[in-house]
Regions:
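Active-site-proximal alpha-helix that buttresses catalytic centers in soluble enzyme cores
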Residues: 2-118, 123-126, 134, 150-151, ...
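Generic beta-sheet signal
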Residues: 45-46, 137-145
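Short helices/loops that flank or line small-molecule/ion binding pockets
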Residues: 131-137
Length: 198
């Protein structure tokens, strides 16, 4: 009996301490949301945004090339862009992967064509350090990238068991302080921006 109780205790403790997927920031209490907004105003935030719906994996009408996004995806990207605009983009650097679907997503999200960066397409074992290296003090950083890159980042920040396929146009928010210390804050899915900013 003692062994069974000990086994259950170990399993429960392991489950509680098991790093899981980031929390949905739109479901946080008002104080947590206010803290996120304060950190955004201070320029302490980096956000990894997954591109919009892929044309080559959907039956929805495409905007153009098959490696781009769908019309529905462009509308979702524009909606997420409105959320970022409500946060304020005056002190925000925006970078995108050079792949067509991320470039199109960034264009519809921000009504501009942000600078492309190859590391946002290749990702891999240096993703966490690359994000920190590109984050300028007192300026937010928005990175339009891919689900595999977001998964690499989550694994390198201790979320080894996070869901591996981020939703289209979902945004992973991270706080990076002046000394490069990183804290994953959570995600905002495309449909949750109004709840986040209420």
């Amino acid at each position: 009996v003692a062994i069974a109780v000990l086994t259950v205790a170990v399993l429960v403790t392991g489950f509680i301490l098991w790093p899981k997927s980031p929390t949905n920031l739109a479901e946080e209490n008002a104080q947590a949301r206010a803290q996120l907004l304060q950190q955004w105003k201070a320029g302490e935030i980096a956000v990894l945004v997954r591109h919009a719906e892929r044309c080559d994996r959907s039956d929805n009408p495409c905007l153009g090339p098959a490696d781009g996004i769908t019309r529905i995806g462009s509308e979702a990207a524009a909606g997420v862009g409105q959320g970022f605009a409500r946060l304020g983009l005056q002190q925000t650097d925006i970078l995108t992967s050079p792949v067509t679907r991320t470039v199109q997503t960034a264009h519809y999200m921000f009504n501009s064509d942000p600078q492309t960066q190859e590391w946002l397409a290749t990702c891999g074992t240096t993703m966490r350090n690359d994000v920190v290296a590109h984050k300028v003090a007192h300026r937010n950083l928005v990175l339009v990238t891919h689900s595999g890159c977001i998964a690499d980042f989550e694994e390198q920040t201790g979320l080894k068991h996070a869901a591996k396929d981020a939703e289209y146009t979902s945004a992973l928010f991270v706080r990076i302080d002046g000394s490069g210390q990183l804290q994953v804050l959570g995600i905002v899915n495309a449909e949750d921006w109004n709840d986040l900013l209420k």
